[in-house]
Amino acid sequence: EAYNKALAIKPDYADAYNNMGGTLQEQGKLEEAIEAYNKALAIKPDYAEAYYNIGVTLKDQGKLEEAIEAYNKTLAIKPDYAEACYNMGITLQEQGKLEEAIEAYNKTLAIKPDYADAYNNMGRALKEQGKLEEAIKAYNKTLAIRPDNAEAYNNIGATLKEQGKLEEAMEAYNK
């Protein structure tokens, strides 16, 4: 209701449409959210955040190719948008495009070197490729940034187990 009042006063308020989209998305009204983001873009065609939000919403709907298109539009406008690079990586990884996902995570880390989750997901992609030592290095970089990251310890344990290093795996699981 507050967004509608804002738009009644200022109909070309792109931020209100973008924020309305976020609220609709949180309510699970994904199609309506995309409509709101598109209204924001009709007013402000270079609105990187609206494209990003469309990408996240499309990914939530399982429309991975369309999500990637939205992330690409985001990055064309705002090349240093770390979250768009990161979510692009996740989406590519879900499609099994591991090399492209790793490239996206590397771009994320070039923009934001302390993005722990990018290292963790890169480790998962490397593990899927069978590059177990590289995966462990990526997980350790996650832990260098966020020592309390339980998922990274679990991933290290699973990777060590896959290597047959069972005692080391148990140590990682117990951390």
Question: Where are the language model's segments positioned?
Answer:
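Canonical positions in the second alpha-helix
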Residues: A6, K39-A40, K73-T74, K107-T108, ...
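Short, intrinsically disordered, charge-balanced linker/junction segments flanking boundaries
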Residues: E167-K175
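Conserved alpha-helical positions within TPR/SEL1-like repeat arrays
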Residues: D15-E26, E49-K59, E83-E94, D117-K127, ...
